[in-house]
Swiss-Prot record:
This is Probable ATP-dependent Clp protease ATP-binding subunit. GO terms for cellular component: cytoplasm. It comes from the Bacteria. The lineage of its organism: Bacteria, Bacillati, Bacillota, Bacilli, Lactobacillales. CDD domains: AAA (cd00009), RecA-like_ClpB_Hsp104-like (cd19499). InterPro entries: AAA+_ATPase (IPR003593), ATPase_AAA_core (IPR003959), Clp_ATPase_C (IPR019489), ClpA/B (IPR001270), ClpA/B_CS2 (IPR028299), ClpA/ClpB_AAA_lid (IPR041546), ClpA_ClpB (IPR050130), P-loop_NTPase (IPR027417). ATP binds at residues 121-128, 452-459. Gene3D superfamilies: 1.10.8.60, P-loop containing nucleotide triphosphate hydrolases, UVR domain. The gene is clpC. Keywords: ATP-binding, Chaperone, Nucleotide-binding, Repeat. It comes from Streptococcus pyogenes serotype M6 (strain ATCC BAA-946 / MGAS10394). Residues 380-570 are annotated as: II. Residues 76-325 are annotated as: I.
């Protein structure tokens, strides 16, 4: 007699057992059935029976929960999504760091009355994730006994209204939904954006039609319906709480944004899902950068949503740059081989099934090798580039670990702002202190009051600071305070309040511009001309780094640099000897509490004639940049430069007269020569008989 050892390559006992159980309605059948002593039990109870040898005590509630399953044509099946079933099938993402909210929600659901929780929190904090976590907890049995056999069904409110154009259709749909829930006995409804139930389905007050909230109230009060809702704080206050009869039937569960550490753990928990989806490797430092950059550069949104979106955006961008073409083919082939294997087992063709199994193993090895060789690894710089694409902030040029840039900020500013070394050094010290992390985090990056005569470089220093910090001279929100010299101009800063014209249109206000561009220089030009009420508002910005607009939104100024300029106390007759005490000179123009709010009050000195030698080179470099667009190069002789300085120097007016002279003597003459000789591309400016002349450069 031949002894069967189980090692026959064509016969596998596992395949025989699985096929036998499938034919008996057990393993791998569409509806597994387990009968013990004539009693049908669930797969979980059968597993318990195999381990202990004892059948669990039968309960009517458990039996009912198994038998009363929604029909295929029911409202629940057509309009709802069974989150508990998706959790059983492993289709839901893991939920991390929300144990408290899940526990609070489960405890409210386990109450005898008023067991309808509403999750309230800002957009993106993870309210829906809490419900998905609750569904997973129900599947795992980590919930109170009262809700162990419950099924959470998500209902889209808009789908309830679809197709109910005839009078009474909406009410009939809702009544059918309530009846199905009552008959099932184990259904918990989940309404996302639950504030929409107020007014949903209702028409005019004369038609007699009822809204969704009015229909649900009796069922909620009698406990016939268990409901979970999710909405934002503003919508909950403006809709649910205004309806006292509806509000008392709900219990609020606050969902706050997770901390940076919790968000990092959330990203670690879902990392595999995004790596498999995009075929991109996401190391820990990339996850940390996604959290840090989203907090720092996307303040208007909430964690963890903004960090997850930033990570997803980065992975999608890298996947688009490194497309994977043959991986889908391998996965499709594996699916075909699995189907072929199952058909072969069903026909008891074990030789063919073994061949398919071998082919599947080979394909899986190819995918593993493919992943190891083809997967692209994301870097912190990729996250920075994603932030730059999303917000326009040049993060790659603002890396906080670039200590060399902080060390050289003073020399870079001095190369463009001439003759104001003390002012530049004071600004550089404040910026270094903040960017190195040794400053108060709630105030702006820096707040400065530039005082001094006109034309000495106050505005130019602000432009160069914007270029060095934020990568562009255009990163300046410039306000001419002469336009804010009356009390009504407050609306230009924060917008109008409710009831006034322009309440909904605050696009050009300071608060709205900072909200859209949180990394910028806020330049308050000629601050002494502003109304005292404007100064009062600015006190809060300088001290707390925030300002509340007319619609109640708090705008964060902590990533801005506030620069106010003034030439108050500096007239045309000023001399160097009269500039003894800067505070004595500006005190008559500003309130003490306003001056005390600035990090530094910086005095700008009059320019000397030797300073203009460097300034004229900078201005002529700008002229060369302009002519280069036409393909023209310009050379200027030293005597021509000296002539420009002699014409443009004015001790009281600063460098502005020099700019005018260059426009008249250089730009205008180049224009005239170009119109007469458009073919000439090399020009030279020389001094001839006391006059500046433009001619062709033959060298």
């Amino acid at each position: 007699m031949t002894h069967f050892s189980g090692k026959d390559p064509f016969v596998n006992m596992d395949d025989i057992f699985n096929q036998l159980m499938a034919n008996m309605g057990g393993y791998r059948s569409e509806n597994p059935r387990y009968l013990v002593n004539g009693r049908e039990i669930t797969p979980e109870e059968f597993q318990h029976y195999r381990q202990t040898g004892q059948l669990p005590v039968a309960t009517t509630k458990a039996t009912n929960s198994q038998m009363l399953t929604p029909k295929a044509d029911s409202v629940l099946t057509q309009l709802g999504t069974n989150l508990t079933q998706e959790a059983r099938q492993g289709h839901l993402d893991p939920v991390i760091g929300r144990n408290k909210e899940i526990q609070d929600t489960a405890e409210i659901l386990a109450r005898r009355t008023k067991n309808n929780p509403v999750l309230v929190g800002d957009a993106g904090v993870g309210k829906t994730a809490v419900i998905e976590g609750l569904a997973q907890a129900i599947v795992n049995g980590d919930v109170p006994a009262a809700i162990k056999n419950k099924e959470i069904v998500s209902i889209d409110i808009s789908s309830l209204e679809a197709g109910t154009q005839y009078r009474g259709s909406f009410e009939e749909t809702i009544q059918n939904l309530i009846q199905e829930v009552k008959e099932a006995g184990n259904i918990i409804l989940f309404f996302d954006e639950i504030h929409q139930i107020v007014g949903a389905g209702a028409t005019s007050s004369d038609s007699g039609s009822k809204g969704l909230a009015d229909i649900l109230k009796p069922a909620l009060s009698r406990g016939e319906l268990t409901l979970i809702g999710a909405t934002t704080q503003d919508e909950y206050r403006n809709t649910i709480l205004k309806n006292a009869a509806l509000a008392r039937r709900f219990n609020e569960v606050k969902v706050n944004a997770p901390s940076a550490e919790d968000t990092f753990h959330i990203l670690m928990g879902i990392r595999n899902l995004y790596e498999q989806h995009h075929h991109i490797t996401l190391p820990d430092n990339v996850l940390k950068a996604a959290v840090d950059y989203s907090i720092q550069y996307i303040p208007q949104r909430s964690l963890p949503d903004k960090a997850i979106d930033l990570l997803d955006m980065t992975a999608a961008h890298l996947a688009a740059q490194h497309p994977v073409t043959d991986l889908k083919t391998l996965e499709t082939e594996i699916a075909k081989q699995k189907e072929s294997q199952e058909k072969a087992v069903a026909k008891e063709d074990f030789e063919k099934a073994l061949a398919a199994k071998t082919r599947i193993e080979t394909l899986q090895k190819q995918i593993e090798q493919h992943n190891q060789s083809q997967n692209v690894t994301a870097t912190v710089n990729d996250i920075a580039e994603s932030v730059e694409r999303l917000t326009g902030i040049p993060v790659s040029n603002m890396r906080t670990n670039d200590l060399e840039r902080l060390k050289g900020i003073s020399s870079r500013l001095k190369s463009h702002v001439i003759g104001q070394d003390e002012a530049v050094a004071a600004v550089a010290r404040a910026i270094r202190r903040n960017r190195a992390g040794f400053d108060d985090g709630n105030r702006p990056i820096g707040s400065f009051l530039f005082v001094g005569p006109t034309g000495v470089g106050k505005t130019e220093l602000a432009k160069q600071l914007a270029l060095d910090l934020f990568g562009s001279k255009d990163a300046i929100i410039r306000l001419d305070m002469s336009e804010y010299n009356d009390r009504t101009a407050v609306s230009k800063l924060i917008g109008t309040t409710a009831g006034y014209v322009g309440y909904d249109d605050n696009n050009n206000t300071l608060t709205e511009r900072v909200r859209r561009n949180p990394y910028a220089i806020v330049l308050l030009d000629e601050i002494e001309k502003a109304d005292p009420q404007i100064i009062t508002l600015l006190l809060q910005v300088l001290d707390d780094g925030r300002l509340t607009d007319g619609q109640g939104n708090t705008i964060n100024f902590k990533n801005t640099v506030i620069i106010a300029t003034s030439n108050a106390g500096f007239g045309q007759q000023d001399t160097e000897t009269s500039e003894s005490n800067i505070m004595d000179r500006i005190a008559p123009y500003f309130r003490p509490e306003f001056l005390n709010r600035f990090n530094s009050i910086i005095k700008f000195n009059h320019l000397q004639k030797e300073n203009l030698e460097e300034i004229v080179d900078l201005m002529l470099a700008e002229v060369n940049q302009t002519t280069a667009k036409k393909g023209i190069s310009l050379t200027i002789a030293d005597d021509a430069k000296a002539h420009l300085i002699d014409l443009g120097y004015n001790h009281a007016m600063g460098a502005r007269p020099l700019r005018r002279i260059i426009e008249q003597e250089i730009r205008d003459r180049i224009t005239d020569y170009y119109l007469d000789h458009p073919e000439v591309k090399k020009l030279q400016a020389i001094l001839k008989e006391g006059q500046l002349v433009i001619r062709q450069n033959d060298q």
